[in-house]
Amino acid sequence: MRYIFLPLTVIICMIFNFCTGISQKRTLQLYSYIYSNNLHIHQDILSKFSEMATKVKTKLVKKEKKEELNNDLETKLESVKTKKAVKKTPKSLTQTKLDFATPTASPTKWAKIPPLDPKEDVDEAYKKIAELREKSNVYIGAHVSASGGPEYSVPNAYNILGQSFALFLKNQRTWNWKALSKSAIEKFKSNMSSHNYDPKFVLPHASYLINMANPDPDKRNRAFDNFLDDIQRCEQLGIKLYNFHPGSTCGLCEKKEGIKHISDCINKALEMTKGVTIVLENAAGQKNVIGSKFDDLKQIIANVEDKSRVGVCLDTCHLFAAGYDIRTTEQFDQVMKDFDSVVGLKYLRAVHLNDSKSDLGSGLDRHENIGKGKLSEETFRFIVNSPYFKNIPIILETPVTEGNEGVYKQEVKLMYSLLD
């Protein structure tokens, strides 16, 4: 009987192969199954055919969806890799025509440095600014991106004509970080040399998460580990300065206790590192925040054992927001005299150059672009010509928003144009 249905079996298997698209091997397996089990009645054959076809089609649909999903993922991954390749593999790290993200003054906003103006020769423009820097001993730059690694911060700084620069040494908004690679360290140093940057005019900024004034020992220890890691990165890269915000008591302890916690952490970090000066940044006067008054900075420094490795960075926006009026030459000079008498000019290691959106004494940390806030362009004229700010990094942290992506280069040029 089986021989009677042999032609029908073959025809059904051929149709099965054509309709489902399964391999010839599986088709032959089906044929063998029908033949060996002596399925005499065509209803049995068709029933088995239908059952197996349904299972195979289900598997094929799942397979097709899986392949489609994999293709989509591969396409997306390829797109990401392509973008990373553009950023991480320029023709040469020493070339200046790079386009990376650069931070704004706000910790929640970022913007991109635009492609360089093709009409402007960057090397020639940088040379002109460098000549002004040599004559004046004024080192103005900005906080630039280190996206992809610290080695990329150097050409980014060069692109905006910066004579100094700041950067984050790792992701400033996470507690998780990777160690610096040997390659990144070597490339950073190589770029510093090829672009003629002196490490003493590089001012890394600490993570926004660090708060060593916190009375909670677990949180303070976690902050210290982040703090220490940054300083050790400075050691690896050959950077001499490290800037951080003193911190906040969070309303959980007296200011005196918070100051002691900060000083203790600084002392511990100095014992564990070499060659890096820890720079305290003055605060804007926010509630519970330490460092808005010169006396706060004085007390922290007083408790530091190795005073040769501690300093201060004065932020012009923070000064104004904290109640120090610097809008006229006379007022600015008086503020600097007060700083000298309370803290000491010998501790002044850096400046953050920012206008203020907020009023005098507002206690609000709101940076604005130069000459567009409560401080006039004239204010910055006598600031950059001040004898107090010679031979130290002067860093712009003004807002970079959509539509003014080239603001850092413009402001660097503006500041140097204000020199006498």
Residue ranges with predicted function:
Residues 151-159, 181-197, 228-233, 265-269, ...:
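Short amphipathic alpha-helices and their capping/turn segments at secondary-structure boundaries
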Residues 135-140, 162-163, 197-201, 238-240, ...:
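Short, well-ordered coil/turn segments that N-cap beta-strands
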Residues 212-311:
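Active-site acidic/histidine proton-transfer and metal-coordination neighborhood
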Residues 157, 205, 234, 278, ...:
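Conserved, mostly hydrophobic/aromatic
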Residues 143-147, 170-172, 207-209, 247-249, ...:
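Active-site beta-loop-alpha junctions enriched in small/polar residues
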Residues 54-55, 88, 107, 115-127, ...:
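Histidine-acidic metal/acid-base catalytic patches
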Residues 176-184, 214-226, 253-261, 288-296, ...:
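Alpha-helix N-cap and loop-to-helix initiation/capping positions
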Residues 40-42, 46-204, 214-232:
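N-terminal pre-domain/capping segments
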